[in-house]
């Protein structure tokens, strides 16, 4: 258990110092290794959090959260910053909200950058330079990131496996179904469940909401081909097509969120 107010670890539900409720998970922070040029996720109470597990050099605090910037977004960032297309192709680029980090150096994008952007010009240049936009260095950085954070990733994997096994133990195997939407989250979930239960023959149900992009349908078919042992079914309600329902009752809105309940 962790108290955010006192920044201490405890076994109690209430902090013995301030009395506030504690959290089950210890917070993490993102450190940066300038030598390896990758972020490292560390628990705030890790005694070795300032040491890079790859090169052993001293790291520094970067942010509380971070995500990788894929080459397509990186190209857009270059254009928004009036840089040469693919100028950052050989750099380690990450982001947290509207702040970007290029080789560990912070670059903030203001709201006015997006408000004044020439979207037609951006679309034209994105199309023009996309063929030269390589994943080569990006993949190298991601491989290095995985290596630097392998202990953290192993911990998360074991935690997820334990959760799945505990939940699955309450049901007969033939009643276990994986809901598959064709997105990254359901792909990761399917992978975790199959590996945790050591059962590649589990039932996967792809819910076609009639709103799917062609690429999603294509990916669902490709997923099915790549997992021949899985029982893969498609659920589609042909009686309620999204756009037809919109004509009858109007589109989903903040005050009437009918989409999820219907599909």
Where on the chain are the PLM-derived regions?
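ATP-dependent adenylation/nucleotidyltransferase module used to activate substrates
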Residues: 2-43, 50-78, 82, 87-263
């Amino acid at each position: 258990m962790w108290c955010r107010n006192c920044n201490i670890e405890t076994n109690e539900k209430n902090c013995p110092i301030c009395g506030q409720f504690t959290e089950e998970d210890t917070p993490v922070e993102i450190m940066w290794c300038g030598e390896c040029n990758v972020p490292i996720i560390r628990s705030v109470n890790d005694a070795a959090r300032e040491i890079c597990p790859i090169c052993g050099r001293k790291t520094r605090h970067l942010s509380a959260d971070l995500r990788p910037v894929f080459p397509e977004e990186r190209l857009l960032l270059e254009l928004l910053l009036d840089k040469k297309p693919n100028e950052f192709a050989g750099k380690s680029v990450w982001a947290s909200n509207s702040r970007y980090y290029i080789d560990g150096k912070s670059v903030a994008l203001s709201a006015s950058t997006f408000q004044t952007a020439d979207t037609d010009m951006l679309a034209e240049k994105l199309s023009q330079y996309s063929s030269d936009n390589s994943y080569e260095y990006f993949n190298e950085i991601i491989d290095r990131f995985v290596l630097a954070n392998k202990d953290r990733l192993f911990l998360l994997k074991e935690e997820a496996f334990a959760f799945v096994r505990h939940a699955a133990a309450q049901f007969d195997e033939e009643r276990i179904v994986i809901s598959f939407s064709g997105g990254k989250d359901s792909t990761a979930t399917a992978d975790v469940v199959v590996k945790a239960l050591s059962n590649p023959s589990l039932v996967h149900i792809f819910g076609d909401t009639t709103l799917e992009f062609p690429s999603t349908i294509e990916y669902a078919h490709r997923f099915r081909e790549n997992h021949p042992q899985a029982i893969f079914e498609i659920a589609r309600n042909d009686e309620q097509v999204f756009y037809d329902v919109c004509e009858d009752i109007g589109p989903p809105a903040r005050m009437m969120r009918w989409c999820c309940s219907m599909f």
